[in-house]
């Protein structure tokens, strides 16, 4: 009998309309992986943040049509993966989308999966580099809500997957020019305390960038890894993307910015990178080139499809590993999903 496979794509989510901004913010900051405090304190803080930031966030979303593009981008990726996967397998499968902080939530998706009645589930995060605050939170939430006994295979990350790297290299090469430029590989920031607690995120970001730089094979390439989207007074990963654009401006170096941890266009790319950070470059009259996210890039979709095929064909019914089916993080990273779920 052929397998029936439920594939679940994990992503952050976002407000479908301006009125959903506050509940989205509440869900985000109520997550214990984001604010690790006990209730009722975490609930109170999430309420305060969602109320105080609502108007500012609504104004930001109004710049891109008053909604999150991430939702429709994820739908496009789902369709592209579905079509590609059909070329390789005869098994029956359905791809579901599970957003962490907006609909469709885990309970809703699990209900749909139960109706489908699969023989196994494969979890695929649309976060190439693992963090306990993104993939870790989504996987934990899904497993806490599932109430059926089905084998579950979990892809924790794919920061150095061959075609994932090739997809980035291909897009970057299209935008390169023979000028005095610096590449900034901009990743979403994290508080340093999360990294110090054993989260492998920044390690995996470096691994991704090292592979891309090696494949670009440009002598004396001027590049830096930077971090964006910091919030609040606590210490975050450095250097900050906006500070590095400022520095490049003072040096009269043109900027090529690569959103290295994002695979979908959303508020952090369309507003923060395209509008806010570009203003810094404009102030110094330097050229500012923003590389698109991978989206439905054919090489990237091939990469995700190949990862899924590897896990579909793996006989380990409860596999939790990187895309290469082995652990890639040093043991000091205790928050690695391989530690948390095995």
From Swiss-Prot:
<dbReference type="InterPro" id="IPR019772">
    <property type="entry name" value="Ferrochelatase_AS"/>
</dbReference>
<feature type="binding site">
    <location>
        <position position="268"/>
    </location>
    <ligand>
        <name>Fe cation</name>
    </ligand>
</feature>
<comment type="function">
    <text>Catalyzes the ferrous insertion into protoporphyrin IX.</text>
</comment>
<keyword id="KW-0627">Porphyrin biosynthesis</keyword>
<feature type="binding site">
    <location>
        <position position="188"/>
    </location>
    <ligand>
        <name>Fe cation</name>
    </ligand>
</feature>
<dbReference type="GO" id="GO:0005737">
    <property type="term" value="C:cytoplasm"/>
</dbReference>
<keyword id="KW-0408">Iron</keyword>
<dbReference type="Pfam" id="PF00762">
    <property type="entry name" value="Ferrochelatase"/>
</dbReference>
<dbReference type="InterPro" id="IPR001015">
    <property type="entry name" value="Ferrochelatase"/>
</dbReference>
<dbReference type="InterPro" id="IPR033644">
    <property type="entry name" value="Ferrochelatase_C"/>
</dbReference>
<keyword id="KW-0963">Cytoplasm</keyword>
<dbReference type="GO" id="GO:0004325">
    <property type="term" value="F:ferrochelatase activity"/>
</dbReference>
<keyword id="KW-0479">Metal-binding</keyword>
<dbReference type="GO" id="GO:0006783">
    <property type="term" value="P:heme biosynthetic process"/>
</dbReference>
<keyword id="KW-0350">Heme biosynthesis</keyword>
<dbReference type="InterPro" id="IPR033659">
    <property type="entry name" value="Ferrochelatase_N"/>
</dbReference>
<dbReference type="GO" id="GO:0046872">
    <property type="term" value="F:metal ion binding"/>
</dbReference>
<keyword id="KW-0456">Lyase</keyword>
<protein>
    <recommendedName>
        <fullName>Ferrochelatase</fullName>
        <ecNumber>4.98.1.1</ecNumber>
    </recommendedName>
</protein>
<comment type="similarity">
    <text>Belongs to the ferrochelatase family.</text>
</comment>
<comment type="pathway">
    <text>Porphyrin-containing compound metabolism; protoheme biosynthesis; protoheme from protoporphyrin-IX: step 1/1.</text>
</comment>
């Amino acid at each position: 009998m052929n397998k029936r496979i439920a594939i679940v794509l994990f992503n952050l989510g976002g407000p479908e309309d301006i009125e959903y901004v506050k509940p989205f913010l509440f869900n985000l900051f109520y997550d214990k992986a984001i604010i690790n405090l006990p209730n009722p304190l975490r609930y109170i803080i999430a309420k305060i943040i969602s109320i105080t930031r609502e108007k500012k966030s609504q104004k930001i979303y109004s710049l891109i049509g008053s909604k999150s593009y991430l939702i429709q981008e994820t739908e496009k990726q789902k369709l592209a993966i579905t079509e590609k996967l059909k070329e390789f397998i005869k098994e029956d499968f359905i791809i579901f989308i599970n957003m962490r902080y907006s609909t469709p939530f885990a309970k809703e998706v699990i209900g749909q999966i139960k109706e489908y009645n699969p023989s196994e589930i494969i979890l695929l995060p649309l976060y190439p580099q693992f963090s306990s605050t993104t993939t870790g939170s989504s996987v934990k939430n899904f497993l806490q809500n599932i109430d059926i006994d089905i084998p579950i295979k979990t892809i924790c990350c794919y920061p150095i997957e061959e075609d994932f790297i090739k997809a980035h290299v291909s897009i970057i090469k299209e935008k390169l020019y023979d000028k005095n430029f610096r590449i900034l590989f901009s990743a979403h920031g994290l508080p340093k305390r999360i990294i110090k607690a054993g989260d492998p995120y920044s390690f995996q970001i470096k691994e991704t960038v090292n592979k891309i730089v090696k494949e670009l094979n440009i002598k004396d390439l001027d590049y830096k890894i930077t971090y964006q989207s910091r919030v609040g007074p606590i210490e975050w990963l450095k250097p900050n993307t906006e500070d590095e654009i400022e520095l490049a401006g003072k040096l009269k170096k043109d900027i090529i910015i690569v959103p290295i941890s994002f695979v979908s266009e959303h508020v952090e790319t369309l507003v923060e990178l395209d509008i806010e950070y570009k203003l810094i470059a404009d102030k110094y009259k330097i050229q500012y080139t923003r590389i698109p996210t991978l989206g439905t890039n054919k090489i990237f979709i091939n990469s995700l499809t190949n990862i899924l095929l590897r896990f579909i064909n793996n006989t380990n019914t409860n596999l939790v590993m990187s895309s290469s089916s082995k652990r890639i993080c040093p043991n000091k990273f205790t928050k690695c999903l391989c530690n948390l779920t095995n």
